[in-house]
Structure formats: structure tokens, C-alpha cells
Amino acid sequence: MESTFHSDTLDSFPNYQENSLNTNEEQTNPLESLRDGWASSNSSSSSSLLLPDENEGNEVFGSLKGLVTQSKFGQWANKLSKSLQARRRKSESISKPRVYYSVFMAPSWVLHAEKHWEEYPHYAGYDYKDYVRLLDATKEAIAHGVFPVLISKGSSGSYFVKNKVQKNIAVFKPKDEEPYGKLNPKWTKWFHRNLFPCFFGRSCLIPNTSYLSEAAACVLDRGLGLYLVPYTSVASISSPTFNYDYFARKAFLTRNKPLPEKTGSFQQFLDGFVVASKFFAQHPWPGTRHRETREYTESVASSEDFDIFDPFLAENEIETEFWTEELRLKFRFEFEKLVLLDYLMRNTDRNLDNWMIKICYEPCDNEEYYKSINLLSTNLTPNMSANSVDPAISQTSDFWKGPHFQIGAIDNSLAFPYKHPDSWRSFPYGWLSLPRSLFTQPFTEFTRQLFLHKLTSREWWEKLSDDLRNVFNQDLDFDEKMFSRQLSLVKGQAYNIVEVLKNPLMNIYDLLELPNLYVVEDVVRIEVNEPTSANSEEAEFGLPIKRDYGSILHPSCSQTFPPYPGSQLLQATPGRSFSSNAEALLPLNYITLLSKDSSSPKMLKDVIFERLQCASSNAVFSTC
């Protein structure tokens, strides 16, 4: 490994400076070189991480390197380096088998729909090209002396990023300034960590991954086609206004040494949006008593403060000058997207101050809005027929020509837990403090069709899993087992969503009343036909090549596979029945379900069988 240390650290060795100038034509960043040394598979010893390479004639460096290498510290560093390299190579080269049996079953009216909606109607959102443009504008502004500004609210080091004209364009959250990061500039969490260790952190979340959770929320949002989360990605920025340790700050001030770049989440700034608490204070939802004097930012209120409405009688809601019937329907259309997104990624920190609302008074020219109008049932009684999924487009409707809403889901740093929260601190969703009538209406047909189509697609889940893994894999402490647990929880939440959306009369309250689940993947080796071509899935499994995730059936089975051992089914879930008898069917007995064509050559193949697992509801005293 070539030398990556600064010359000022070795002022007493002039020969090294001269030799390094002759051997290294291109100088590299010392921090990047050190990080690459820990992760590079070409590094063979820890001494290359601790000392630069010396010439054969340099006796001083030879003796120093020998002492370090032979010492216990050098041996420990060598083992640590190799273990980190092996774990990184293992996580990068992982190849999972494909899912052969899934718990997600799509209804027939979704499988046979002529039109599958891929995304919600939305306005032009930021993409990767816009993110690169904003990042370049940020670095250019910092070079001209326009530095990010610390946000006073919140418990972590978050910064408003500005361009050269002092306009907010993004929000940056460094990793080491997270709520419990070592360089958090706010003292609240320092007191929590040092004086109240019993109430430190959230045991259901992986520590120091909040910045990755922000980026993963954007990946999930784009995968579902919601466009609620502002475009977010991981970036590296350095600025004097960031919180650095004493040595980095002193080197910058005294020796003019550049400040090291900080890695964190870089999120687009939402212009023209208002936080939900202020919006509902200005425009109270109709049907709430004492709405002139009561704030919506309080905790979940009792039912006495709200009028209880019949979920199918919209006329019980009082129509105001602002909240007309059409405007209420438009807001529900956007609000249920936020509910499903938070539920799917199990956001543990959603309140009325970290999601935003914008009213657009300009006429909507988006053709997708006109296409979706007939999918919004104005009488709030959905229809499950296939014709309702692909309705006739009425271009004459002026439903979307008036004011409409946009919702921004910001601050998703405390999402994607690896286990469900303990029952003694469950982290309820903050939007539950809104009036009851927002939650008692059934989901719109557009939402039901789009979510069922995506959440029961094997290809969609495979792509989402790869995209989420690429996000969380950016951290040097990435653990594949912990990521699998995170994905298992997301799939458990998705299973509840699928089961609720199958019923056209279920609403948000019905979704939140379901038990917490995990979807566990069991790798099973089965006997299949030997493939004869590149696209030979039909010949290999005896199944059609083009099939949906929830419709994986074998010709020898009449409707579906027998119950999988160990699966736990909810008695309240209609149309499903699981067996808890482990002897009912052994995993390898699935081999008998394959094609009985003995003339075809056979081969063994690893596949995945999914099963449900209920989360423990017992309260366990642990850090929160």
C-alpha cells in the first residue's frame, strides 16, 4: 500500500518526504485512503494501515514497522482488518435464491386487470440529476463562503443548505451528529446518554443509521410511486459550520488543513410547504368540536373531543368554506398514501411537525389525475369489479381543476427498525391525533389497486430488496443479518396491508388493529428439472414464465400449496388458515409437488419459502 500520510506528521524523517514525492505522483486524501485500506481486499497486513511504506535503506522506518507488526497491537489490528475485509466481501457477493412460495396472494381482480397503475399522479419530482445539481450548487456556495446553517429544532445536528443566493435548497444530516452521535451539537441527547442510560436510544432501531433510513425511505417511496418523500440520498460535505472535534478544528485554524468531509443524508428542501400542525390550526378539519381553541399538536385525544361519524355518511361532516366535499376527498387521497408509507417502513417518529402540506391553486394539467378521478369513489363505497380498475376516462370532469394538495414526508430518520417496538413504548403514529373521520373511510380504489399490484409482485420485491440493500450497504458496519430482519419486518407490515386492501370496506383503523408480523424466509433445497436454456423457468419448475408473485402455483396443485410448517395465521384474517403442526408437511416434501416427468434430468436448487411469524407482545425492559 502506498503512503497516504501527510508529511507534517513525519517532520522528523526528511528522507520519507523526499522518497514519497518520488514514488507517489498523485497524492490522495488520507481519510479516504485509510478507509479504503480497511475495506480493500488487497491489503495483507495491518502495518500498511499504520505506517507508510519505507525504502529498503531507511532503517528508521524498518525498525518502527517491525516493532508495530510484531507487537500485540499490530497482531490485533491485522486480525481486525482481515475480519472487516472478509465481512465486506461476503456482504457484497451475497446471492439470494428466488422466492418459490410466498405469503402474498393477489386477488383475481388485480391479476386480470387490463391496466396496472405504476405510480400515483404527481407533479414533477426531483430525481438523481436534480440531486447532483443541488449537491454541486451546495459545494459551490460553500466555496464562496455561504455555509449551511444549524437548525435549532430537533435533537440532532441538522443543517439548512443554501445556494450562492442564500436560498435554502436542501437539508443535510451528518452521520456523526445524529441524536446519539459522538459529535451531536445539542446537549439534550448528551444528558440522556450519560445521565439516563436506562432511557437511552430506541432498542428497535440499529444505531447510527438514521442517515441511511432517510435515503431508504426515498427508495421505498419511489418504488411505490408515491412521491411523498423529497429526493434523498447519501452525500459527503465539509463546512466550518459543522461540529468537528478539537483536533480537526485546531488543524483547520492553525495549519490551514482542510476539514474532513462528513457523510450524511442530503434531502431536497420543500419550498412553499407548511407543517401539518400549522396547517390544521389554520384550516381545522370539519367535524371537530372546539376546533377554534384546540390545537392538533396534542397527543392522541379521547373520543369525547370528536364527533363520531358513520364511515359511509359523508354528509355528517360539516362543510365549511374551505373544506368542501371535493377538497376533503382530495386530501384523503393524499393522506392515505402517507399512512401506508409510514406503516410499511414502521416509522417510529411521525408527528404533526415532520410532515408538510401544500395547497396548489393552479389548475392541474396532469393527465394522470383525470385518469384517476373515476377510481375515487365519491360515495365512499368501492367496487371490486375489474371494470372499476380500468375505468373509462372522462376528460370533461373538472374535479381536479380546483385546489388540490401535496404532502411532503420529511424526517424519516427513525424508520426501518429491525424488530417491532416493545409494547411498553410502542411509538404510535402522530397523525392518529387527527379527527376520527379521516380514518373511518375505506381506502380508495386507486390505492387498493396500485398497492396490491406492487406488494404481490415478486419482481417488485426483488428490486426493492436490492435497492434497500445498496442503501444500507454504504455503511461500513453493515450487517446482512440485521438487514434481513429489517426486510422481514417490512414484509410483515406489507402482508397486513395486502390483507386489508383485499376487503373494499376496510379502513385505516382496521389496518392499525392487526397484530405485528414478520415474514420469515426459509431456504429449501428442492429437486427441479435441469434447465435447457437461459430463460428456462418454465422447464425448470414446470410453471409459466410470466406469473405474478401471489399466484405461484404448480400444475399438480389444485389451488395452492398445503400449509407450511410453523406458520402462524390470524384467526381473524378471512380466507386464510395456517397449520401449527410441524409434522403436517416437511420442507423437503415439496419435492413431490414438482413435475412427475421422469424423462427430464433433475438437479437440486435452493429456493425460498416464506412464512408468517407473530411478533412477541410481551413487554421487555430494555433501552428505548
UniProtKB/Swiss-Prot annotation:
Region ranges (Activation loop): 409-429
Stretch list, region Catalytic loop: 346-354
Keyword Metal-binding: yes
Pfam families linked to this entry: PI3_PI4_kinase
Membrane topology: Peripheral membrane protein
GO cellular component: cell division site; endosome; fungal-type vacuole membrane; Golgi apparatus; Golgi membrane; plasma membrane; trans-Golgi network
Cofactors that this protein relies on: Mg(2+); Mn(2+)
Biased composition (Low complexity): 40-51
Location within or outside the cell: Cell membrane; Vacuole membrane; Golgi apparatus membrane
Region (G-loop): 151-157
Record flagged with keyword Lipid metabolism: no
Domain PI3K/PI4K catalytic span(s) in chain numbering: 145-520
Location of the region described as Disordered in the Swiss-Prot/TrEMBL record: 1-53
Listed GO MF terms: 1-phosphatidylinositol 4-kinase activity; ATP binding; metal ion binding
Reactions listed under catalytic activity: a 1,2-diacyl-sn-glycero-3-phospho-(1D-myo-inositol) + ATP = a 1,2-diacyl-sn-glycero-3-phospho-(1D-myo-inositol 4-phosphate) + ADP + H(+)
Enzyme class label: transferase
Its EC number(s): 2.7.1.67
Keywords linked to the UniProt accession: ATP-binding, Cell membrane, Golgi apparatus, Kinase, Magnesium, Manganese, Membrane, Metal-binding, Nucleotide-binding, Transferase, Vacuole
GO biological process, one term: endosome organization
Composition skew (Polar residues), residue ranges: 1-31
Homology family: Belongs to the PI3/PI4-kinase family.
Biological role stated in the UniProt entry: May play a role in endocytic and/or exocytic pathways.
Protein name (database record): Phosphatidylinositol 4-kinase lsb6
Gene that encodes it: lsb6
